[in-house]
């Protein structure tokens, strides 16, 4: 269980968000500028809240009152950014192994093979990122994050830079990840169609505040972009 209760002044925006996220995929949904990326950056330890606390499965990652602020590399949180951020000079195999090495985990061929199969990237292992499609790059980025052995996976608008065809390509893998990986996911998006496909819980944000939390019915009044 992820428990978030944070406040942060970001220029003119006062961010104040409180929510819990259990197994499955929790979507942070709202318009651009609502504070979604700032929230996941605080969970990852890349942005420090002014007040509040963040905990995963009872382990405190941040608590302003108690002076606790666990460094990002010790939080065991996987992060997939909009553009993937693969190393261009490394092969797909080497990019994947980078995630494992950065976490200090031993090499386990069975885990590597399981994640490669889950994301269907075995045929890409010897390629460089420049030889991949946008959807393939994002699948590799997800694989690298999983090989860090995270207890939580953050995905910050991972489809935002992709055209509709590549969004359709990667969406089934994200659904499979949600159902088969056994790792809670926090998925950031302002696109209702994506959230409907992936999320099990929705947290709606607007102007830095949580306005509602619940099921997919919270998307009923949202504009739906066509992905079907």
Which residues make up each language-model segment?
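Conserved ABC ATPase "signature" region
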Residues: 59-64, 107-124, 175-176
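ABC ATPase NBD coupling module
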Residues: 61-78, 102
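Conserved ABC ATPase signature
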Residues: 128-132, 136-138
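A short, proline-enriched helix->beta-strand linker immediately N-terminal to the Walker B motif
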Residues: 147-151
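Catalytic Walker B motif of ABC-type/P-loop ATPase nucleotide-binding domains
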Residues: 153-157
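Helical segment within the ABC ATPase nucleotide-binding domain
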Residues: 168-181
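Conserved H-loop
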Residues: 182-188
């Amino acid at each position: 269980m992820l428990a978030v209760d944070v406040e942060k002044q970001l220029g003119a925006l006062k961010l104040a968000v409180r929510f819990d996220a259990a197994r499955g995929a929790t979507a942070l949904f709202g318009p651009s500028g609502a504070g979604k990326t700032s929230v996941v950056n605080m969970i990852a330890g890349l942005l420090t809240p002014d007040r509040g606390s963040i905990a995963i499965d009872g382990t405190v990652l941040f608590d302003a009152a108690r002076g606790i602020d666990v460094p990002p590399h010790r939080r065991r949180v996987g992060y997939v950014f909009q553009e993937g951020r693969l190393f261009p000079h490394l092969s797909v195999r080497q990019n994947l192994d980078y995630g494992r090495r950065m976490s200090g985990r031993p090499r386990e061929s069975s885990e590597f093979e399981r994640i490669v199969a889950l994301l269907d990237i075995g045929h890409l292992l010897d390629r460089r990122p420049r030889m991949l499609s946008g959807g393939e790059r994002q699948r590799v980025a997800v694989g690298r994050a999983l090989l860090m052995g995270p207890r939580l996976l953050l995905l910050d608008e991972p489809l935002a830079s992709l055209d509709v065809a590549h969004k359709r390509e990667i969406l089934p893998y994200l659904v499979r990840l949600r159902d088969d990986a056994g790792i809670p996911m926090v998925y950031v998006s302002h696109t209702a169609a994506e959230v409907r496909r992936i999320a099990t819980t929705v947290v709606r944000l607007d102007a830095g505040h949580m306005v509602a939390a619940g099921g997919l019915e919270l998307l009923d009044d949202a504009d739906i972009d066509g992905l079907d």
